[in-house]
């Protein structure tokens, strides 16, 4: 399979095909500050977007990759970027390397570079909060996204897994039949932020469905942030997961820095040795020219981090509840499709 690094990003849509920034008239007066019509019937704003991201087809290198950009293109996530390789933002799915760079840069901006807020919105929509990490998405509006197509619960969960798994590593997915909603937990928050924008107002129909041509008549998925699980055991597991994620990130960054720094030092030392001792054996000289170990880049330090990570993993496994005992937000979430 070809990596996105081996190709240029695709132009997802022509500029002439982009919708107007002014919404359809639903009132008497247009407010230029809020980009909304007032003094009229608001109507149903739910719809199925005519644009959709296809990660394998659309991903590729952009001008942002060459400029060292950290943030991703919001319009790429929505499937409607008209710049392609000329875009100043990234056009691929966030991976571990991107997540490590974002974590070092800031915690108050999302993966698109937008400022987060102190608290979540009342309806759990929007950009999110910088106070708490949230990797779980609530997925509603499933009936409208299927154009009322009747499917078994296992089939619905399978479709949710298919469309969301393309947008990052999934921790777990659960479909709650009684409330006709689903929950998708990603391994990293940046992937959850990306998927929330990419899957909002998208259909769950597939090209093989006979209803595919009429998909625009549906209302699309409603994707929001999931509420925090009030269960103390679940909160403890969450803290352990965050601690383990931080340790994983530290090991990943230290390994990368050690490898890159070691390569650079060796190259410089070899150049110096070639100029100074072109013919003599220089094994002893190489040892004297190597930098002193500061303790942070040694194998012992990395091994200690890995041991701590293993201990946390064992505690996490031993504290997990049995399969038959389910609870938390997967069953107690009060939102519905009509939110």
From Swiss-Prot:
Function: Involved in the first step of pre-mRNA splicing. Required for cell growth and cell cycle control. Plays a role in the levels of the U1, U4, U5 and U6 snRNAs and the maintenance of the U4/U6 snRNA complex. May provide the link between the 'nineteen complex' NTC spliceosome protein complex and the spliceosome through the U6 snRNA. Associates predominantly with U6 snRNAs in assembled active spliceosomes. Binds directly to the internal stem-loop (ISL) domain of the U6 snRNA and to the pre-mRNA intron near the 5' splice site during the activation and catalytic phases of the spliceosome cycle.
Lineage: Eukaryota, Fungi, Dikarya, Ascomycota, Saccharomycotina
Subunit structure and binding partners: Belongs to the CWC complex (or CEF1-associated complex), a spliceosome subcomplex composed of the U2, U5 and U6 snRNAs and at least BUD13, BUD31, BRR2, CDC40, CEF1, CLF1, CUS1, CWC2, CWC15, CWC21, CWC22, CWC23, CWC24, CWC25, CWC27, ECM2, HSH155, IST3, ISY1, LEA1, MSL1, NTC20, PRP8, PRP9, PRP11, PRP19, PRP21, PRP22, PRP45, PRP46, SLU7, SMB1, SMD1, SMD2, SMD3, SMX2, SMX3, SNT309, SNU114, SPP2, SYF1, SYF2, RSE1 and YJU2. Interacts with ISY1. Interacts with PRP19.
InterPro entries found in the cross-reference section: Cwc2/Slt11, Cwc2_RRM, Nucleotide-bd_a/b_plait_sf, RBD_domain_sf, RRM_dom, Torus, Znf_CCCH
Zn finger limits (C3H1-type): 67-94
Primary localization class, coarse: nucleus
Gene3D superfamilies assigned: 3.30.70.330
Localization per record: Nucleus
Name by which UniProt lists this protein: Pre-mRNA-splicing factor CWC2
Record field: transmembrane: none
Highest taxon, organism lineage: Eukaryota
Stated family: Belongs to the RRM CWC2 family.
Encoding gene (name): CWC2
GO MF annotations, alphabetized: pre-mRNA binding; U6 snRNA binding; zinc ion binding
The keyword Protein transport is assigned to this record: no
Keywords of this entry: Cell cycle, Metal-binding, mRNA processing, mRNA splicing, Nucleus, Phosphoprotein, RNA-binding, Spliceosome, Zinc, Zinc-finger
PROSITE patterns (UniProt xref): RRM (PS50102), ZF_C3H1 (PS50103)
Gene Ontology CC terms: Prp19 complex; U2-type catalytic step 1 spliceosome; U2-type catalytic step 2 spliceosome
Region (Disordered): 313-339
Domain notes: The C-terminal RRM domain and the zinc finger motif are necessary for RNA-binding.
Modified sites of kind Phosphoserine: 335-336
Note: Present with 2650 molecules/cell in log phase SD medium.
PANTHER family with a match to the protein in the record: PRE-MRNA-SPLICING FACTOR CWC2 (PTHR14089:SF2), PRE-MRNA-SPLICING FACTOR RBM22 (PTHR14089)
UniProt GO BP: mRNA cis splicing, via spliceosome; mRNA splicing, via spliceosome; positive regulation of cell cycle; positive regulation of RNA splicing; spliceosomal snRNP assembly
């Amino acid at each position: 399979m070809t990596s996105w690094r081996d190709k240029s990003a695709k132009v997802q849509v022509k500029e002439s095909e982009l919708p107007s920034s002014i919404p359809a008239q639903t009132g008497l007066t247009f407010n230029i500050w809020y980009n909304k019509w007032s003094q009229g019937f608001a109507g149903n704003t739910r719809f199925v977007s005519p644009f959709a991201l296809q990660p394998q087809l659309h991903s590729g290198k952009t001008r942002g990759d060459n400029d060292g950009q950290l943030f991703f293109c919001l319009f790429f996530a929505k499937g409607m970027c008209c710049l392609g390789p000329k875009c100043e933002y990234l056009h691929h799915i966030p991976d571990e390397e991107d997540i490590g760079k974002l974590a070092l840069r800031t915690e108050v901006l999302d993966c698109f570079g937008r400022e987060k807020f102190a608290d979540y919105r009342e309806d759990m929509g929007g950009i999110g909060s910088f106070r708490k990490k949230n990797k779980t998405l609530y997925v509603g509006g499933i009936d409208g996204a299927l154009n009322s197509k009747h499917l078994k619960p296992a089939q619905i969960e399978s479709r949710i897994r298919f469309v969301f798994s393309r947008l990052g590593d999934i921790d777990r997915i659960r479909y709650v039949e009684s409330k006709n909603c689903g929950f998708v937990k990603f391994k990293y928050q940046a992937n959850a932020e990306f998927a929330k924008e990419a899957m909002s107002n998208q259909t769950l129909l597939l090209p093989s469905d006979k209803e595919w041509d009429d998909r625009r008549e549906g209302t699309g998925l409603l994707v929001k942030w999931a509420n925090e699980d009030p269960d103390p055991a679940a909160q403890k597991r969450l803290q352990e997961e965050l601690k383990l994620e931080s340790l994983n990130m530290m090991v990943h960054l230290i390994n990368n820095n050690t490898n890159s720094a070691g390569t650079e030092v060796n190259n410089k030392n070899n150049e110096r040795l070639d100029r100074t001792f072109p013919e003599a054996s220089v094994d002893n000289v190489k040892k004297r020219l190597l930098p002193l170990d500061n303790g942070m880049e040694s194998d012992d330090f990395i091994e200690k981090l890995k041991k701590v990570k293993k201990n946390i993993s064992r505690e996490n496994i031993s504290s997990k509840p049995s399969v038959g005992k389910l609870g938390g937000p997967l069953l107690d979430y009060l939102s519905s499709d009509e939110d």
